[in-house]
UniProtKB/Swiss-Prot annotation:
GO BP: any one term: regulation of mitotic cell cycle
Record flagged with keyword ATP-binding: no
InterPro entries tied to this protein: HORMA_dom, HORMA_dom_sf, Mad2-like
Function according to Swiss-Prot or TrEMBL: Required for the execution of the mitotic checkpoint which monitors the process of kinetochore-spindle attachment and delays the onset of anaphase when this process is not complete. It inhibits the activity of the anaphase promoting complex by sequestering CDC20 until all chromosomes are aligned at the metaphase plate.
Keywords: Cell cycle, Cell division, Centromere, Chromosome, Cytoplasm, Cytoskeleton, Kinetochore, Mitosis, Nucleus
Record's protein name: Mitotic spindle checkpoint protein MAD2
Induction remark: Cell cycle regulated expression with a distinct expression peak at the G2/M boundary.
Keyword Nucleotide-binding set for record: no
Amino acid sequence: MASKTAAAKDIITLHGSAAIVSEFFCYAANSILYNRAVYPEESFVKVKKYGLPMLLIEDESVKSFMSNLTSQISEWLEAGKLQRVVLVIMSKATGEVLERWNFRIETDNEVVDKGVSREKSDKEIMREIQAIMRQVASSVTYLPCLDETCVFDVLAYTDTDVAVPFTWIESDPKLIANPQMVKLHGFDTKIHKVDTLVSYKNDEWDEEE
């Protein structure tokens, strides 16, 4: 008698999906800050996450910022109010925007409105996240070297009716003129779909002028 093997599916709730996506952004942001040398190598500690060696910053002020950010992102995701999160890397000296790491989020509104759940294997979600993290780790191969001291900021694009904490302020989009863009892998919890794109300043245009 032939037997059938079904792929294991895990129940994904709105709360669980929000936790997955907000945690992903925290680890992705730390990896970007490390791989783009925004902070020195010795500022990070190695941990294991998503079946990969990952790096987390030990600077207390940045850790606190990331913790508050993760909590706020999770809250907005559960409310279905978050459209995208952008990590911006800027020149410390001039404030010029050098890179924008854009995480666009699509939400299954039926889950938000009706409280239903979805099904997807945790392992499948992890594999999709692994692919993104590997691309971030190899960013030195496709992004220009940041040969100056840089700082970062995080922008959140939300629905207009969302309550914004006093710790957040309205900002310009911090765009880059004539950017080069690289589309990275995305992942999907079946409730939140995340697409990733990095845009960067193209110095070659300046050299040709």
